Amino acid sequence: MAAAAINAAAPPPPVAPTAPPPPPPPPLSQASGRLPSRVLELVFSYLDLPDLRSCGLVCKHWYRCLHGDENSEVWRSLCGRIVSEEALRTDILCNLPTYKAKMRAFQHGFSSSDCSRNVYIKKNGFTLHRNPIAQSTDGARTKIGFSEGRHAWEVWWEGPLGTVAVIGIATKRAPMQCQGYVALLGSDDQSWGWNLVDNNLLHNGEVNGSFPQCNNAPKYQIGERIRVILDMEDKTLAFERGYEFLGVAFRGLPKTCLYPAVSAVYGNTEVTLVYLGKPLDG
């Protein structure tokens, strides 16, 4: 009995100390920030554009890796997969110095689902071909419009102009086809256009004067690139020919989404449009 009581009162054996729990893993933003840029660039080069947009939001390191060099392997690889070989091989994109700029231009090309049924967008993604349909005026809008910022794009005809050839802008509501040979862009209050044939400015079915405002303005030459400048801050539309600023054609544009657009009447003519991005001042 006494021995049992003594044993019951004995202290418990010492417990070995337990190791502290491991520290939690670093947040994803910290871990990702340690990856070398060359490794990230290699991984990013296999991703599509929506995934790249998501990656750019992970951390500053990833964002800088994606957008620091517009000629990096990431954009070269994506450009090669999406932009047509013809567009990259010919001079269509000659005024775009980087792969990222070429990708951006492709995203802003003509919309094959938002154009007249009498035109189609060629495989290069930048050129509109009008079929030889009699008594029809046919147009097309780009895939992306603008409601803010400053934007520039180039347009040029690669075939005859016919009696009407108009470049300009349009809302989503503006029609892209009508009967007869007319200036479709500028035929209502939803579009603004410059007719390259007679140099008239058109809006709301009316002629708003000649353009450019000079004596004996030169006629448009086939293949000549016209630069269009849309300023949604000042609400103006202007044009350039070569390195010459021709002036502001329209003022007081509405605060709505406006799309680069063209309209044509000549059968088998072709029109190319290339988005350039933000215009360079001066």
Swiss-Prot record:
Keywords of the record, alphabetical order, are: Ubl conjugation pathway
Q: Which InterPro entries match?
A: B30.2/SPRY, B30.2/SPRY_sf, ConA-like_dom_sf, F-box-like_dom_sf, F-box_dom, FBXO45-Fsn/SPSB_families, SPRY_dom, SPRY_FBXO45
Q: Does the keyword Protein transport apply?
A: no
Segments for region (Disordered): 1-32
Taxonomy, superkingdom: Eukaryota
Q: Where is the B30.2/SPRY domain?
A: 88-280
Cited Pfam families:
F-box-like, SPRY
Q: Which Gene3D superfamilies match?
A: 1.20.1280.50, 2.60.120.920
State which pathway it belongs to: Protein modification; protein ubiquitination
Q: Which CDD domains match?
A: F-box_FBXO45 (cd22111), SPRY_Fbox (cd12907)
All residue ranges annotated as the F-box domain in the record: 29-78
State which residue ranges cross the membrane: none
BP terms from Gene Ontology: protein ubiquitination; ubiquitin-dependent protein catabolic process
| Keyword Transcription recorded | no
For bias type Pro residues, the affected ranges are: 10-28
Protein family: Belongs to the FBXO45/Fsn family.
Question: What quaternary arrangement does the UniProt entry report?
Answer: Probable component of a E3 ubiquitin ligase complex.
- This chain's protein is named F-box/SPRY domain-containing protein 1
Q: Give the organism, scientific name.
A: Xenopus tropicalis (Western clawed frog)
Q: Taxonomic lineage per UniProt?
A: Eukaryota, Metazoa, Chordata, Craniata, Vertebrata
